[in-house]
Amino acid sequence: MAAPAPAGAAASPSPKPQLPSPFAELVKTPSGLEKVVLRGARNCCAEIYLYGGQVTSWKNDNGEELLFLSSKAIFKPPKAIRGGIPICLPQFGTHGNLEQHGFARNRFWSIDNDPPPLPVNPAIKAFVDLILRPAEEDLKIWPHSFEFRLRVALGPSGDLSLTSRIRNTNTDGRPFSYTFAYHTYFFVSDISEVRVEGLETMDYLDNLKAKERFTEQGDAIVFESEVDKVYLAAPSKIAIIDHEKKKTFVVTKEGLPDAVVWNPWDKKAKAMQDFGDAEYKNMLCVEPAAVEKPITLKPGEEWRGRIALSAVPSSYCSGQLDPLKVLHG
């Protein structure tokens, strides 16, 4: 196994990191944590904290926030930030022996000034590359050496993409396995007026019923109570329709076979110290993931998983998406 990173290497970002994009700015927040602000075309923007490598804000050209961030979110390590897009690695949820959702979301990442080449759209100007390597404390609980490179980018039309590359850097010949998720919190106007399309007839594991396996009905998913499901072999595109705002989020995923859908509803919301009692009404998590079948990498192998998020106006006729063919086109 590779030698652990020097003490403190993963505990704080570089003193004066250089940002490769003139459309990215490193800002120190009132909490003392640093974040990168990406500014795209037509006033679109996104914010990414170095703590957790976590996107916490994504705004469209009207300045409208598209991601949910709890008003009670705690910006103090080692607490994870409630909202945005936490990264779950090397374990999703309780699917393993590590802490809930693994440790990547509550470690300090560094700006990656020399990432390996990544095919990109030349029209994308606003982006940042981050990197996470294990510190000694991580190797004690998960004894594997790895490099996790993350690119967050704003497209010319305001879409947001996250590309993860995870490489096994063990030097002792050992493979490792992990589960993963982009724990994406979408901001919605009213959860009772939201429906999700693209997961009809899919098999899922119900985390509220001891991970028992069921098959979804043929209708779009609507929300009337707590939901915590892992949809298996989910399609590459999923649509989240917010009727009240006449807006559709389109989630496109690559390298991530599953999709988690979660809303804690009222009782669990009240039990969380970093979540407002009624905030469940304004959020929905739809999380591209690899949960049922862990990803295994041999030394030197690299995995890539990507999501692209967009928000488009939606019109509805007889409960179907208009001819934009969001799910298929």
From Swiss-Prot:
Transmembrane segments: none annotated. Keywords: Isomerase. GO terms for cellular component: cytoplasm. Residues 1-20 are annotated as: Disordered. Residues 1-13 have a biased composition (Low complexity). Disulfide bonds: none annotated. Substrate binds at residues 82, 100, 105, 228. It comes from the Eukaryota. The active site is at 183, 287. It catalyses: alpha-D-glucose 6-phosphate = beta-D-glucose 6-phosphate. Its EC number is 5.1.3.15. Belongs to the glucose-6-phosphate 1-epimerase family. This is Putative glucose-6-phosphate 1-epimerase.
